[in-house]
Amino acid sequence: GCPVISEEIIKRINVAAKNVFFSTGSAKLLAKSNAKLNDVVAILNENPTYKVQIDGHTDSQGADDKNQVLSESRAASVKTYLVSKGVDESRLSSAGYGETKPVADNKTAAGRAKNRRVEMTLSNY
């Protein structure tokens, strides 16, 4: 089988994902995202067999179709950033799920904030 990905690396990827920020209603990455995304680049450089799936999610505010496009665009922005730092595009995939996979209640601002997110999943195969 493939070597197991360490808990520490999984934690670093999850911290990075939680620190990805965009302009409101936009797929433009904010500069404060860069440090943690650079950590993802470092992990991928250290582990050439690892791949990353990048998933974008939105809250339920606004039209479903716009949220779907926004979630896809945001995931693609993260992918583009990683490629710009030298990660081979073949190791990255991105997808958007719009508002279809909430992790919190969309009725509250705090819940909506949790639902607006990027998730990154490492694989080693």
Task: State where each predicted segment sits.
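Periplasmic peptidoglycan-binding/tethering modules of Gram-negative envelope proteins
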Residues: 1-51, 125
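Periplasmic OmpA-like peptidoglycan-binding domain that tethers envelope proteins to the cell wall
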Residues: 27-34, 53-125
